[in-house]
Amino acid sequence: MKSKTTKKTIPKEYLDIEKWQTDRRSFLRGALVAGAMTQIGFFTSCSVKLKEGNDLLTPEQATILDDIINIFFPDDGNGPSAEDINAFGYVMWLLHDTLNRKIEDNAYIIVGLNWADETAQEIYFAPFVELSQEQKENLVGEFTKMKWGSNWSSMMITLILEALVLDPIYGGNTNEVGWTWLNHTPGYPRPSETNRYERIMERQMKLKKDGEV
């Protein structure tokens, strides 16, 4: 049965995708200096389980996310794949980030997964997860030509690139595979567990709260 098609409205923050990418790069520069975003253990212990569904994504959404990012960055011998850099785990951390990201930012990631599924049913009359690999790749090629798909895909590729270039302590760039591929030597001092992103944000929020008392 063909699913009901919803209106695909791009959030205003993402209408100018180039500005969003510039703002995101500015945040990354600060994050690289400030410290790490998360603990490696979260990603290594949960990434497989998350693909079975979790508190934010259904099993279908998790599968769509994993499939799409691996189509964007495939294991084709031309550089690290999305799986190599644990892009799925990095995106899942972003979806759980309530300190820096707006609810609307994370909602846009998820709604894009739903739109991809709707587009699959519009073109192939079947859910995304039931498509063959060739059909999935063709579908991604088709929706990236659409306004919503071009915008959403640009955002997702930017996030995957973050997983490629950040310090491994952030959860992506597993075993420094991204740095090795880019022949990049990281700056020092490297981020540590004591000054990772959440801890810095928590301290800032506490100082702000104490100042309001």
Regions found by a protein language model. Name each.
Residues 16-26, 41-79:
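C-terminal segment of N-terminal export signals and the immediately downstream linker at the start
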Residues 10-15, 26-46, 132:
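N-terminal export signals
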Residues 34-38, 75, 163:
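Generic hydrophobic alpha-helical segments
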Residues 1-22:
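N-terminal secretory signal peptides
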Residues 2-3, 78-80, 86-213:
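Mature-region segments of soluble proteins
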Residues 22-32, 100, 110-112:
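Short, amphipathic alpha-helical segments
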